[in-house]
Swiss-Prot record:
PROSITE patterns for the chain: EFP
PANTHER family cross-referenced by the UniProt entry: ELONGATION FACTOR P, ELONGATION FACTOR P (EF-P) FAMILY PROTEIN
Top-level taxonomy: Bacteria, Pseudomonadati, Pseudomonadota, Gammaproteobacteria, Enterobacterales
GO cellular component: cytosol
PTM statement from Swiss-Prot or TrEMBL: May be beta-lysylated on the epsilon-amino group of Lys-34 by the combined action of EpmA and EpmB, and then hydroxylated on the C5 position of the same residue by EpmC (if this protein is present). Lysylation is critical for the stimulatory effect of EF-P on peptide-bond formation. The lysylation moiety may extend toward the peptidyltransferase center and stabilize the terminal 3-CCA end of the tRNA. Hydroxylation of the C5 position on Lys-34 may allow additional potential stabilizing hydrogen-bond interactions with the P-tRNA.
Organism whose genome encodes this protein: Blochmanniella pennsylvanica (strain BPEN)
Cytoplasm among keywords: yes
GO function term, MF aspect, one: translation elongation factor activity
Name the UniProt record assigns to this protein: Elongation factor P
Main function: Involved in peptide bond synthesis. Alleviates ribosome stalling that occurs when 3 or more consecutive Pro residues or the sequence PPG is present in a protein, possibly by augmenting the peptidyl transferase activity of the ribosome. Modification of Lys-34 is required for alleviation.
Length: 188
């Protein structure tokens, strides 16, 4: 177990706060004219995603979090778990659907994902920034829609629903931003 003094705080440092792994987003060291120096720290809880702010006095220590981020390829899933494989040693890691959360709509076979482990237990699955998926269904367009914005709803192969321009057809591959769920372009 490694302990960090407030002088060692830096952006991206992974710590334990309230028995939950966190990553420091920003920190500000303040040395007042009178009194003890302190550090104001903003951090994000990795599991819940909440952003918190806390002030630490000089002399305070925080425990480091045993966090590993590994790049794995998604292979398959059963009723309970989604399985990711390390391509170097062919080890599989089972991840429960509740851990994947809303990112489940961006999970597709043979694509690489970042799996975050805390004490060798998966706590987060992060998809790539953008992925290419095939359109399997498009909502019908009404001919009398005069105030249309030039978009229609398309369902992709993973089941996610994405707004796409009118010129996109059924069966096309499109590129989607997984952070926002927005159509980027046709796949090349």
């Amino acid at each position: 177990m490694v302990l960090y003094n407030i002088n060692e705080f830096r952006t991206g440092l992974k710590i334990i706060q309230n028995r939950e792994p966190c990553v420091i987003i920003s920190h500000e060291s303040i040395k007042p004219g009178k009194g003890q120096a302190f550090s104001r720290v903003r951090f994000r809880q990795i599991i819940s995603g909440k952003i918190l702010e806390k002030t630490f006095k000089s002399g305070d220590f925080l425990e480091s979090a045993n966090i590993m981020e590994i790049r794995l390829v998604y292979v398959y899933h059963d009723n309970e778990f989604w399985y990711f494989m390390d391509e170097k040693n062919f080890e599989e890691i089972a991840v429960a659907a509740k851990i994947i959360g809303t990112n489940i709509k961006w999970i597709t076979t043979q694509l690489h994902y970042i799996v975050t482990l805390w004490n060798k237990v998966p706590i987060l699955v992060t998809p790539p920034d953008s992925i290419e998926l095939k359109i399997i269904k498009i909502t019908p367009i009404k001919k009398n829609s005069t105030g249309s914005s030039g978009i229609k709803l398309a369902t992709v192969s993973t089941g996610a629903i994405v707004k796409v321009p009118f010129f996109i057809q059924l069966g096309e591959l499109i590129k989607i931003n997984t952070r926002s769920g927005i159509y980027i372009s046709r796949a090349k």
